[in-house]
């Protein structure tokens, strides 16, 4: 819980590689610690020695013939939810696509264009660091109620600018994130996008919407990883 990959976690991921997995994904790495940190076990490339633990784990996976991958995420309006450091939790502001009040009473601020630009750039920066640490694939977490999903969802996203409204606009943040990652890692480096095919609650996006989202982002990704549901 120090932002690094510990020896037990490394052994767990190496065991997956030994078992014959084609790719093994480490989860889940924050891209923008200033506005994120939902639980105690997030990885954080800003922590001293974290990249050394990344490199060691990537090598442990690769030595068994599997491709080491890392999942990049941002919790958005649910940042701080399960943090064990309560002093940091209480000092962490929550941000999402639109201003609202969470079901637990926490106020959420609307991300400005400047903050969106900063988070988009952070995805690329962390992806580049992961590549230098020896990872050969990136998973971008865009499902289950985290920030990218919040932009995709009409339930969370009530913006009236270029990031809200129709599906094309609601996909704009995800598209920019994926493009930022691609620019950082270069060609020939697979990008996996993890998404909820349907949010499975009234007011969220449907399976038909999920198909449209996948089609909208198809040209930005190499692999689509579909599950279902959301934090909400």
Question: What are these language model-derived features?
Answer:
Residues 1-232:
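Flavin-dependent oxidoreductase catalytic cores
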């Amino acid at each position: 819980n120090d932002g690094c990959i510990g020896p037990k976690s490394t052994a767990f991921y190496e065991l997956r590689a030994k078992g014959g997995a084609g790719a093994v994904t480490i989860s889940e790495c924050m891209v923008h610690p200033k506005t994120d940190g939902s639980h105690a076990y997030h990885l954080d490339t800003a922590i001293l020695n974290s990249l050394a633990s990344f490199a060691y784990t990537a090598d442990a996976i690769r030595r068994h013939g599997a491709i080491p991958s890392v999942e990049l995420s941002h919790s958005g309006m649910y940042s701080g939810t399960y943090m064990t450091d309560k002093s940091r939790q209480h000092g962490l502001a929550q941000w999402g696509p639109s201003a609202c009040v969470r079901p637990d009473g926490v106020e959420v601020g609307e991300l400005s264009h400047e903050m969106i630009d900063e988070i988009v750039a952070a995805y690329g920066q962390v992806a580049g660091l992961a590549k230098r640490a020896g990872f050969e694939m990136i998973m971008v977490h865009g499902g289950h109620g985290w920030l990218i999903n919040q932009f995709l969802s009409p339930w969370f996203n009530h913006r009236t600018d270029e990031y809200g409204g129709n599906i094309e606009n609601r996909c704009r943040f995800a598209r920019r994130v994926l493009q930022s990652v691609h620019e950082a890692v270069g060609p020939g480096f697979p990008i996996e996008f993890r998404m909820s095919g349907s949010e499975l609650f009234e007011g969220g996006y449907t399976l038909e919407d999920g198909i449209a989202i996948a089609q909208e982002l198809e040209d930005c990704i190499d692999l689509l990883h579909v599950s279902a549901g959301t934090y909400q």
